[in-house]
Regions:
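Positively charged N-terminal leader segments that act as targeting/secretion signals
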Residues: 1-14
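Buried hydrophobic residues that stabilize the cores of well-folded domains
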Residues: 20-422
Length: 422
């Protein structure tokens, strides 16, 4: 197979994270829907595509921070055959996700390889009509300590799992064990209506029932030895909003009920559990302006309140179980993000403050302790500096005026190395 490198980059700067995650999810993690991986579709989501002889046979989508890459192998019609999604930490792979397709945009095999040498393998099987009817899940861990193992496993174009030298990988080293199997059932026109998960490590079976027309879940059950242990029933409004959840357990005499209320635009205005109000939200022009969380175990007293006076401003209040104000938080992000917190004693006097200011290049956090007389007893301040790619490059700590600084290269912390990948 020819290998022409195609680098695909997102054009929108403000939503690069969201677009990347959504794009990867659309392409890789939904086995029920045929893959939307044609070249035309990919080009619409990208800034540029490099073609060879008018065809793309390999491709790469690169995360803006260069910490995540997704490499693709296509056939001549633009269908994805192999996908390799890897997240980098420093200069090695922190997690690897490998995907193999059948050339008809159906997922056949997937691997999740973690830096801790833990492995997850899924196998997918389809009916003659092309519907997914079984998924087998395996888990394992490599026998010896080999932290770079996740970095060089990959699929060859013919679908074989290979090592860094291109030879067939020794799967037996992974000690894979079959954990559970998921079976899928459909109605007469191919709509998913039931999902059954049978586990080999746990004596139990999980079943999920769906509405074939809307795809919404209707019921979840857990069985042990043929006896139903748990059941969740879901009821929706005519508009499709979740209205009620009923939970039953074989050891409980009465069911537990959750109920949701909405305004005309579908915004959730109230959440009740067993008839008691747990959360209420007030909206103005489709935007939340107030949310109150109540303590259902203490007569329905408010324990948290959040106000949004403006789109870039938020105020949070937390009450103690004895109804005195415990903490207040003020958040603004106009011209830089700022988070201010105040802590109070039972008589209403403050006993501490915390302020955090952060931008794309730095974060500054200050904490003060206050005694009963209102005097500041201690001050601590932390300063973190970042480069343009988000790497931590400076770190200072000040306690009561005494400054400590650290060389980031010798400081024993985890940070991302955003070096350009090749």
């Amino acid at each position: 197979m020819r290998a022409a490198l195609c680098r695909l980059r997102f054009q929108t700067a403000s939503n690069r994270n969201i677009l990347m995650n959504k794009h990867i999810n659309d392409l890789l993690f939904h086995p029920f829907t045929p893959l939307k991986g044609s070249i035309k579709k990919l080009k619409k989501r990208t800034h540029a595509a490099v073609l060879k002889n008018g065809e793309v046979v390999c491709g790469r989508i690169r995360h803006w921070s260069s910490l995540s890459n997704c490499d693709f192998v296509f056939d001549r019609e633009g269908n994805i055959l192999i996908a390799d999604y890897h997240i980098r930490n420093r200069k090695s792979a922190a997690e690897r996700n490998l995907f193999r397709y059948d050339g008809k945009n159906r997922l056949l095999e997937s691997w999740r390889i973690m830096r801790s040498c833990q492995f997850e393998r899924n196998l997918y099987f389809y009916s003659e009509a092309g519907l997914l009817w079984e998924m087998q899940v395996y888990e394992g861990i490599i026998a010896e300590n080999s932290t770079d193992y996740a970095g060089w496993l990959h699929f060859l174009p013919d679908g074989l799992l290979a090592d860094k030298e291109g030879k067939a990988a020794d799967i037996e080293r992974l000690n894979l064990k079959h954990r559970h199997t998921v079976y899928y059932e459909y109605d007469g026109i191919g709509r998913l209506i039931r999902e059954t998960e049978a586990s080999e490590s746990v004596e139990g079976v999980k079943t999920y029932s769906y509405d074939g027309e809307s795809g919404r879940i209707k019921e979840y059950c857990f069985y042990e030895n043929g006896i139903r242990i748990e059941q969740w029933l879901y009821i929706y409004t005519p508009q499709g909003w979740l209205q009620e959840c009923v939970y039953r357990h074989k050891d409980y005499a009465l069911p537990s009920t959750e109920y949701y209320e909405y305004d005309d635009e579908g915004n959730e205005t109230a959440f009740l559990c067993n008839g008691e109000l747990c959360r209420s939200t007030r909206y103005e022009n489709g935007r939340p302006v107030e949310e109150i969380i109540y303590d259902s175990h203490d007569g329905g007293k408010p324990k948290n309140r959040t106000l949004w006076p403006a789109a870039n401003e938020r105020h949070c209040y937390t009450w103690h179980e004895k109804s005195w104000l415990l903490e207040s938080i003020d958040y603004t992000n106009a011209g830089g993000n700022t988070l201010k917190s105040q802590f109070f004693q039972s008589d209403g006097t403050p006993n501490g403050t915390s302020e955090c200011t952060y931008t794309a290049q730095e974060m500054l956090e200050s904490v003060c302790s206050i005694n009963a007389s209102g005097e500041v007893t201690s001050r601590m301040q932390w300063h973190y500096g970042y480069d343009a790619r988000g790497n931590l490059v400076r770190y200072y700590c000040s306690e009561n005026g005494r400054l400590d600084s650290y060389d980031i290269k010798t400081l024993e912390i985890e940070y991302f190395d955003a070096e350009e990948s090749v």
